[in-house]
Amino acid sequence: MSFKAAEVSSLSERINWEKVDGLVPAIVQDFQSSQVLMMGYMNQDALAKTGETGQVTFFSRTKERLWTKGETSGNVLQLVNISLDCDNDTLLVRVNPIGPTCHTGTTTCWDGDAQEESQMVWLHQLEQLLAARKSADPDSSYTASLYARGTKRISQKVGEEGVEVALAATSGDKAELVCESADLIYHLLVLLQDQGLSMNDVVNKLKERHK
């Protein structure tokens, strides 16, 4: 039994399955961006299979069977962790989504409502775009050309943009400071991706220092 399966088994034992009529709501959240992706229902078997396979599986109330998200589309939800709420009757399932989550092709099942994107969600989407550019033709974009030139050049650009930010601040030009800060953050994100890291790693370090 894997660690995830053992952890899920322990969670299952805390759920009063009789109280919830055999089904618990499972809220699915993107682990990186914290964006809520969808909601489904799990019975004991669906929860167990999720832990065993590492891919989120629900119980379909209409088809009356287990179904693994993405079993036909390939847009699976890779399990990161699961937690129970304080009443032990609702699951929060954190995942790494592979492709769009909604069957309509949108990122979440609420995208059709034109919900306002949070800043962190947009930043995560930018990181995904930058990650995709790593394997792109160097002539196809500035980002791809940066990756092709290697870590030394990317690091140099981060240094240059840092100086530009400092100069903009000392000049008192706030509009220029915003523009130069955007350039710095962009190049820093490229450098993090180049090193196999993300902004989440930086945020986690900040949280650690704040404790």
UniProtKB/Swiss-Prot annotation:
It comes from the Bacteria. InterPro entries: His_synth_HisIE, HisE, PRib-ATP_PPHydrolase-like, PRib_AMP_CycHydrolase_dom, PRib_AMP_CycHydrolase_sf. GO terms for biological process: L-histidine biosynthetic process. Its EC number is 3.5.4.19, 3.6.1.31. GO terms for molecular function: ATP binding; phosphoribosyl-AMP cyclohydrolase activity; phosphoribosyl-ATP diphosphatase activity. SUPFAM superfamilies: all-alpha NTP pyrophosphatases (SSF101386), HisI-like (SSF141734). Coiled coil: none annotated. Keywords: Amino-acid biosynthesis, ATP-binding, Cytoplasm, Histidine biosynthesis, Hydrolase, Multifunctional enzyme, Nucleotide-binding. GO terms for cellular component: cytoplasm. Residues 123-211 are annotated as: Phosphoribosyl-ATP pyrophosphohydrolase. The keyword Cytoplasm applies. This is Histidine biosynthesis bifunctional protein HisIE. It comes from Vibrio parahaemolyticus serotype O3:K6 (strain RIMD 2210633). The gene is hisI.
